[in-house]
A protein has these predicted regions:
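Non-catalytic scaffold segments within catalytic domains of secreted glycoside hydrolases
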Residues: 1-156
Length: 156
């Protein structure tokens, strides 16, 4: 992270580092989608949390990473979720992970009838894909993921 954001991150004293290093009980993760990234030339703006990276919704061939939703930034891609779980596990010494929020919006959902809203095949597909990806991360990749909370109507 320091490589990406440089001096925009605070510096810890050795005492502060010793205090926080290894002190977490679990890793809580909100996740909705994944993105492609590419290097961006020049210096990033001071408030640009991506540093010198550009976040993209399609690959070099112009293929979208996932289907459109009501939220322009949210494109479901469950494989990216699994890869991120594995990366976090490898990077941080296999911490216990709880997915504290995960979900999607549906393109055009504000215009649907009650009957159409109740027959929500898109979210059924989304949760099946994401829960399966999480289960695969646990069983095949050795990720210590222990809990999952869905993004629901109670969150907004």
């Amino acid at each position: 992270m320091r490589k990406q954001l440089g001096d925009r991150l605070p510096k810890f004293t050795p005492e502060q580092r010793a205090l926080v290093q290894g002190s977490n009980d679990f890793y809580g993760m909100n996740h909705y989608c994944a993105n492609y990234i590419k290097h961006k030339s020049g210096e990033p703006e001071p408030q640009d949390y991506l540093g010198n990276l550009e976040s993209l919704l399609s690959n070099k061939a112009g293929q979208d990473i996932g289907p459109e939703t009501q939220s322009p930034w949210l494109r479901p891609y469950a494989i990216g979720f699994r890869k991120l779980l594995k990366w976090i596990s490898d990077r941080y010494g296999r911490p216990t992970i709880y997915v504290t929020e995960n979900g999607t919006s549906l393109k055009g959902e504000n215009d649907l009838s009650k009957e159409e809203i109740l027959e929500d095949d898109f979210r059924v597909w989304y949760f099946k894909e994401y829960v399966t990806a999480m289960a695969d991360a646990y069983t095949s990749d050795g990720v210590d993921v222990r809990g999952y909370m869905a993004w629901s109507l109670m969150d907004k």
